[in-house]
Amino acid sequence: MEFQRLENKTAMDWLYEKTDARNLQGEIDTYWVQQGGCDPVAWCRKLNRRLPLIHLKDYTVIGGRPSFAPVGHGNLDMPAIVNAADAAGCEWFIVEQDDCYGADPFEALAHSYRYLETLARK
């Protein structure tokens, strides 16, 4: 719903345009931004200095359906997302995976962690 278009803007656009940054900060979820038809990198940039937290979730397609994946193992441009969030002043990068589809969630977390370590070294 938050990315539904109303007069060429999303509900999120309206919300952030009408509020002062001192009163409203953001926390986006990369998977759901993408699923909502928007670009997570663009949203990090829109929320410059208003994005203290970000939920990093990767997006993939399994059997023709949108699905969750460990960070770095899906279709989202995680290096660009992490860089944009960092430039926006993000302080907390939270790894989350709503569904592991029967896999061990701790193993999925380990995959995400190892991938993010490679980004931190660059």
Could you tell me what each predicted segment is?
Residues R5-I28, W32-K122:
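Histidine-acidic metal/acid-base catalytic patches
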